[in-house]
From Swiss-Prot:
Heterotrimer of A, B and C subunits. It comes from the Archaea. Allows the formation of correctly charged Asn-tRNA(Asn) or Gln-tRNA(Gln) through the transamidation of misacylated Asp-tRNA(Asn) or Glu-tRNA(Gln) in organisms which lack either or both of asparaginyl-tRNA or glutaminyl-tRNA synthetases. The reaction takes place in the presence of glutamine and ATP through an activated phospho-Asp-tRNA(Asn) or phospho-Glu-tRNA(Gln). SMART domains: GatB_Yqey. This is Aspartyl/glutamyl-tRNA(Asn/Gln) amidotransferase subunit B. GO terms for molecular function: asparaginyl-tRNA synthase (glutamine-hydrolyzing) activity; ATP binding; glutaminyl-tRNA synthase (glutamine-hydrolyzing) activity. Its EC number is 6.3.5.-. GO terms for biological process: glutaminyl-tRNAGln biosynthesis via transamidation; translation. It holds the Pfam family GatB_Yqey. Belongs to the GatB/GatE family. GatB subfamily. It catalyses: L-glutamyl-tRNA(Gln) + L-glutamine + ATP + H2O = L-glutaminyl-tRNA(Gln) + L-glutamate + ADP + phosphate + H(+); L-aspartyl-tRNA(Asn) + L-glutamine + ATP + H2O = L-asparaginyl-tRNA(Asn) + L-glutamate + ADP + phosphate + 2 H(+).
């Protein structure tokens, strides 16, 4: 199998690519964020390209390891007929970046283009609020050999885009999926709007094309549509070539030259790409690559990890942030940047655990109260009454009480049911308000029961 992707990503700008209309099309009533330029009305000339959009495109290209074009940048008219394209053509630039690489997949080119409107065939209406929103199209080489490789690439791309701050989010990403197998021609599946969808498309197309060849048929070069509700693809039309689009330079837009000094300024101010940060974390901090990928899943989380590592051991920090912190963030459905948990909070919690002021079990409960909380871990722990060292005598007394109050559990243990010990450990943790160490308590209970 050979798979290449054409990924369309909306850029994070306040205004459209060739006019000053706002870009908040998702929350606006239909056909309100429009002007004569958006609608390509006679006599309406486009503004010069939005500089913020061009800068965002350059930043993404740099973060994907692309060479920035030193050629003159033209905007071309790409002609095709569809209700969401009022002019009959789409403005798209020649490549801004070329020859990049991500996750072992070569990036052929990145260029800027305008989004068309939104056609609603069930109603026969078009909303032009989206028309003119700036996009980049990221075109890969056909380097992916399985649906899994394509899914991994897209996940990695999302991380890069999130780090860049240049994109409007995964929900605005659309991919055209190109797939062929040995002995067949290429099929293109248009406008797949999720990573899961791209994976399902490739799984379906792989089976469909193999079955055609197995029966002695011929796989057509065609454009197909993905029916998400049925998770299948269906024919749309025969695949177009570049000549079918009748590309010509747009006479209303002057050619552009990208200033190398401006590119260098963008390079100096952009964050370290996620995939490179992952590799550095492994080398610099000696942590596992899986942990590094979790910690670099958000730029702010990665920055927090580096701050925490200035105060505590990197592997200790990685374990707590990977397991406990990410668990709590996932449960609350928030990103680290939204949590109000600071690096100093994480350091304080780790120090409480390391000094045995709180047990791992108590810390498990404490961290659940930290998101959105302005109090320190120590203040939260004191309110929960889970901070403090329990003396051995107090633990022994709690063990004796748990055994005395639960004769059935004792009998179960004597009959070979080791899980009964876990129940008794839970009772001791309740009696000590979670201040006892579960592992040590488990060992002490077994020793006590074996003496009975």
């Amino acid at each position: 199998m050979m798979c290449g992707l054409e990924i369309h990503v909306q850029l994070n700008t306040n205004s459209k690519l060739f006019c000053s209309c706002p870009t908040n099309y998702q929350s606006a009533p239909n056909n309100t964020n429009i002007c004569p330029v958006c609608l390509n009305q006679p006599g309406a000339k486009p503004y010069p390209p939005n500089q913020a959009a061009l800068d965002n495109a350059i930043k993404v290209a740099l973060m994907l390891g692309c060479e920035i074009s030193n050629e003159v940048i033209y905007f071309m008219r790409k002609h095709y007929d569809y209700p969401d394209l009022s002019s009959g053509y789409q403005r798209t630039s020649v490549p801004v970046g070329i020859k990049g690489e991500l996750n072992g997949v070569r990036i052929h080119e990145i260029h800027v283009e305008e989004d068309p409107g939104q056609y609603k065939p069930d109603r026969g209406t078009v909303d032009f609020n989206r028309s003119g929103i700036p996009l980049i199209e990221i075109v890969t080489e056909p380097d992916m050999k399985s649906p899994e490789e394509a899914r991994n690439f897209l996940n990695e791309l999302i991380r890069v885009l999130n780090y860049s701050g240049s994109a409007r989010g995964e929900g605005t990403m659309r991919a055209d999926v190109n797939i062929s197998i040995e002995g067949g021609k290429r099929a293109e599946v248009k406008n797949v709007n999720s990573i899961r969808g791209a994976y399902k498309v490739l799984k379906f197309e792989l089976i469909r094309q193999k079955n055609i060849l197995r029966r002695g048929g011929e796989v057509q070069q065609e454009t197909r549509a993905y029916l998400e509700s049925q998770m299948i693809t269906v024919p749309m039309r025969l695949k177009e070539d570049a000549d079918d689009y009748r590309y010509i330079p747009d006479p209303d837009l002057p050619p552009l030259k990208i200033d190398p000094a401006h590119v260098e300024e963008i390079r100096q101010n952009m964050p370290e790409p996620a995939h490179l940060k992952t590799e550095r974390f492994v080398e610099e901090y000696g942590i596992d690559k899986k942990d590094a990928k979790v910690l670099t899943s958000e730029l702010e989380l990665a920055d927090a990890f580096e701050e925490v590592c200035k105060e505590v051991d990197a592997n200790v920090a990685a374990r707590l942030m990977r397991d406990e912190l990410k668990r709590v963030l996932h449960y609350n459905k928030i990103q680290y940047a939204e949590s109000k948990i600071t690096p100093s909070d994480i350091v304080e919690l780790i120090n409480l655990i390391e000094s045995k002021q709180v047990t791992p079990e108590a810390a498990h409960k404490l961290i659940e109260q930290m998101p959105g909380n302005d109090k320190t871990p120590t203040e939260i722990g004191n309110e929960m009454d889970i901070i403090g060292v329990v003396e051995d005598d107090a633990i022994v007394n709690a063990i004796n009480q748990a055994i005395e109050e639960n004769p059935n559990a004792v009998e179960d243990y004597k009959n070979g049911k080791d899980n009964a010990v876990n129940f008794l450990v839970g009772q001791v943790m309740r009696l000590t308000r979670g201040k006892a160490n579960a592992g040590e308590t488990n060992k002490m209970i077994k020793e006590k029961l074996d003496q009975l």
